[in-house]
Amino acid sequence: MNAALNQWKDTHAARLSQYSAVRVSGRVSAVRGILLECKIPAAKVGDLCEVSKADGSFLLAEIVGFTQECTLLSALGAPDGIQVGAPIRPLGIAHRIGVDDTLLGCVLDGFGRPLLGDCLGAFAGPDDRRDTLPVIADALPPTQRPRITRSLPTGIRAIDSAILLGEGQRVGLFAGAGCGKTTLMAELARNMDCDVIVFGLIGERGRELREFLDHELDETLRARSVLVCATSDRSSMERARAAFTATAIAEAFRARGQKVLLLLDSLTRFARAQREIGIASGEPLGRGGLPPSVYTLLPRLVERAGMSENGSITALYTVLIEQDSMNDPVADEVRSLLDGHIVLSRKLAERGHYPAIDVSASISRILSNVTGRDHQRANNRLRQLLAAYKQVEMLLRLGEYQAGADPVTDCAVQLNDAINAFLRQDLREPVPLQETLDGLLRITSQLPE
């Protein structure tokens, strides 16, 4: 009997430690936008609470800060129906999720609750008996991150020739509105070799989300995917949390030794949602009109992707740029955090050049780890040709260019049509890596030494 009790205690000790024997409660003293003010003794930042509504239902809220007078809670949904004096019951746990294979094929909200699909969801309440993990967590220590050495072809010539990705790499996809970033993201999901795909769709229009589900994801792709969605009409807390929920789900599959592809669209909308939370919490505005919490949370989010001893998370984060300017504060910060960036050009999109990837402006910081010397040399020569053509493009349009002054520029002008044809590609027509490399070598070999 004692042995059985000891075994039960060891099994459930970690779970029991999350709960308190005494339920301390409080009451709402003020509602300020998305923030609720109250007094809760012994509360901790990150703890979840249940707030009673006037109709008898409950609203989940999370403790996000304190002042000298009160505790600040951020509502995880719309605070409609909350009255001053409404009872608050601390749950004694932080936001946690349970992840298993039943999530594959499911569509979840920003907190991990099911939106579509016959599944339990990932959100773990206080009575959840699954093994759970925290949504807000630290990244792996740097000493536990293996070096990126394996290439991960995308089937897209413009990427595989000049910006070849590696398994476990974190890449930004920078684009303005209407440049085809969502279409490119879906194409990457179809083509890249991975076990599980986790989509984080933040701030999307509801119509676009439904079209994405119906037209971009076939049954085969859907069967190995998890979608975490927080549309533009959802609360700022849910939009910001969706990025962490998607990342935590990807981490859980990585811990099981799987190759995970994390596609997060977009970091800009995540930053905007966190800006709303920060302003409501009384944070001062800093660089670019953003509160300090945005610059704190961006690296905490993206550093959680990457290689581990067991598996990998290859992450692609989209970033919205206005007027094709890379000087946007979010874009500038994200570019400094990631292992590479792919830039989509509005000018190329307007010419019908798809995918509209500006190879000259795009870069991979781990390219030398996953490519051979011949590939690197050909990539450098391709960039040399593109740069040479860009320098004389205006002269060519004006009819003022005179050949013979520079053999490299002359070659760039002669090969421009061939290069553009090589970099263009139709959807759903992936090209093998070796075929891409052969085409790249065939073009760049014509450049004089």
From Swiss-Prot:
GO BP, sorted A to Z = protein secretion by the type III secretion system
Which Pfam families does this entry report, sorted A to Z?
ATP-synt_ab (PF00006), ATP-synt_ab_N (PF02874), T3SS_ATPase_C (PF18269)
Give the transmembrane region(s): none
UniProt KW keywords: ATP-binding, Cytoplasm, Nucleotide-binding, Protein transport, Translocase, Transport, Virulence
Q: Which cysteines are joined by disulfide bonds?
A: none
GO MF assignments = ATP binding; ATP hydrolysis activity; protein-exporting ATPase activity; proton-transporting ATP synthase activity, rotational mechanism
State any GO CC term: type III protein secretion system complex
Which family does the record claim for this protein?
Answer: Belongs to the ATPase alpha/beta chains family. T3SS ATPase subfamily.
Q: What is this protein called?
A: Type 3 secretion system ATPase
Species: Pseudomonas syringae pv. tomato (strain ATCC BAA-871 / DC3000)
